[in-house]
């Protein structure tokens, strides 16, 4: 009798499957609709350049060794090769299954039923130390199944990083914790340097773009509370463009963000991750991104990173240092 060979099961986008923890999840977050919307042709100026360097391999090795999830992989970020080749990565905490199903996001969705990796805070801190990072971005899936939304897990991870690598700056791109100021305060007391939460889109499009449990005003309120509670911590948010918003709505959103004391803004082009996700309504030109950056700076943002391939944590270390000026993003 021949030797049995394990054949990996390929899960199609939109299909249900079970994770290694036994959690039922939907691949890429959105169920298959059976429809394939006509896609806008990609403009010539929107090109992703792949970088492969020894640093890329080192980051990948550390991520795999410590069983870390990264938003770079899970959200199919177009900048993964560039960022990893520069020795930086955005680490995704609390697993790779989100309790929400935003219609722009390709992270798998499901209910982890309270599962957490107790070793993750120390593993993450060890990885950051081994990579000798000056700046690290932590993000996570939404964990509405946890009483605190994962705030204490975040705080443990940040404290572990600061203990091993006291000079490392830590940015936390967090879920909204259902608007709980108590949970947000737990995270802010951990020693975090930048508190980020994404408003994602303009107010009019919030319902069709984001999960129903998210809210435009709720995100603004959380960001405002963070600044009031810890004025020394920079606050940050991100907008995707190309979902059907107008330039006037973008500028109005900037005004709302400044009213709620948000320091840093990133603007990037929405790219449809699978056929099951929201279609692209328009491609915003590099010239428009540049104009919007200047408008944002005039409104008083500490920094505005704006470009077709800009994502929430793209070049976050440079943005933190206000070293984004003149970059071709």
From Swiss-Prot:
Positions bound to [4Fe-4S] cluster 2: 98, 102, 105
SMART domains assigned: Elp3
Enzyme class: transferase
Record-level GO cellular component terms: cytoplasm
Gene Ontology molecular function terms on file: 4 iron, 4 sulfur cluster binding; lipoate synthase activity; metal ion binding
Bound cofactor: record note: Binds 2 [4Fe-4S] clusters per subunit. One cluster is coordinated with 3 cysteines and an exchangeable S-adenosyl-L-methionine.
CDD domains registered for this protein in UniProt: Radical_SAM
Annotated [4Fe-4S] cluster 1 binding sites: 72, 77, 83, 313
Keyword tRNA processing: no
Source superkingdom: Bacteria
Residue intervals of the Radical SAM core domain: 83-303
EC annotation from Swiss-Prot or TrEMBL: 2.8.1.8
Cell location: Cytoplasm
UniProt entry keywords in alphabetical sequence: 4Fe-4S, Cytoplasm, Iron, Iron-sulfur, Metal-binding, S-adenosyl-L-methionine, Transferase
InterPro entries, sorted: Aldolase_TIM (IPR013785), Elp3/MiaA/NifB-like_rSAM (IPR006638), Lipoyl_synth (IPR003698), rSAM (IPR007197)
Similarity annotation: Belongs to the radical SAM superfamily. Lipoyl synthase family.
PANTHER family in alphabetical order: LIPOYL SYNTHASE, LIPOYL SYNTHASE, MITOCHONDRIAL
Protein name stated in the entry: Lipoyl synthase
Naturally occurring in which organism (per UniProt): Legionella pneumophila (strain Corby)
Name of the encoding gene: lipA
